[in-house]
Structures are given as C-alpha cells and as structure tokens.
C-alpha cells in the first residue's frame, strides 16, 4: 500500500504485551477492526526485550506471521526497560528490527558508537522520557534516525521539540497517553484534545504503550488513535507527504 492509497497518513506503533498475546486481538489491530471498519491498522509493533527474550521473540514471530498471512507490510520497533545493553544489542542483531530504541540516559558517547555495533539495516531511536531535560537534545537527535518523545505536551510545544528533531534529520515519534482506556471503552475528550493538539506540532508517527500491551481494549485504543490522527491531519497545511514517501520506500511498503 502506498501513502497515496492511505486514508491515514500517520503511522501507528502499538506495543505488544499480554493483551495482544490474544491472537484475535492482535489480528483485529492489524486488520483495522473486522473487515476494515476503520482506515488502516497497526503499522509498527513495539516489542519490549525486557519482557523476556523468549516472550519478545514469540511476539515478533507471531506479528510477522500474521502480517505476512494478510499481505501487510509492517515493521518492528524494539525497546527495553532493562539495563543490560550487551544482551539487548545481541538480541536486536538476531531478530533484526527496523527500529531499535535506546534510553537517553545511556549518554551521548553511547549513541555516537552504537551504530557500529548493530546490523546496517537497524535504525536508531533515542527515547526521551517524561521529565528529561531538553538541553542538549539536539546532540542526541543528530546521532539518531528517530526520537521517541514522552515529554509533556506543553514542553513539546514551548521547546519546539518536533522542529528540533526534524532539523537534525531525526524523525520524532509521539507517545500518546489514554489512561481512561485502561478502565473503559470510551476515552475522555480532554485526552482526545491533548493528543490531537500535540500531533499538530508535526508528529507523523504515534506510539501506544500500556493501552495496547496491558489494557483491556487494545484494538479499541488503536482505533481511537486512528480517528484522532485522521482529524489532526485535516488541520495540517502540508501533510508530510515527502517524509511518508521516504518512509514507505525504506520499509518497502506496497
């Protein structure tokens, strides 16, 4: 599927976990509901190495298997909450994700050398957690292909985080939070507004974490982000066509 054929231009990363170990839920996320009730499904699966190597490998294999079975071109975003970088790097080289994330706390020198330790096809992402100082972020952006932005929406706006990341050829990813969907099927208007408003800063990739990995309504969470993204794109003057064309070309989307 090319970007010209998509109704939603933004790409969605859904983190896999116990909730998506239910194969039916995983398939619903991939296929955008039953018989594609909404526009597009999940583009990229987030997988945590720190959940255990066997667990992570099983989730990746199942996601790739279901994607291939349905002729869907999807990708893997590998992350970890662990501290053993040697094991994490070895696992990444074994399963070859398209994107591999590392926490900013590893330090700038780490990011300057990490590419030489990974397979050539793996793209590097710096994870910027909530509360991280925005000083010196540009140095990290310059070393990476992607940035996972978990900062407060006001900080993202005031500190021009999206522009700074893109100016350094580092594509920013927005971690959307919908805590109400951890309890029920209807997200709050306040959450919708904050996510939509933040996407208008220029994010072209949106990630979900707990909502899809542990939440009771994983597929519903993806559907909500899909709807918010579509509405947000209508308000943007230039819907990032060039970036998407490059992205789809890199991952060989059809």
What are these model-predicted stretches?
Residues 1-254:
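Non-catalytic helical/linker scaffolds that mediate oligomerization, partner binding
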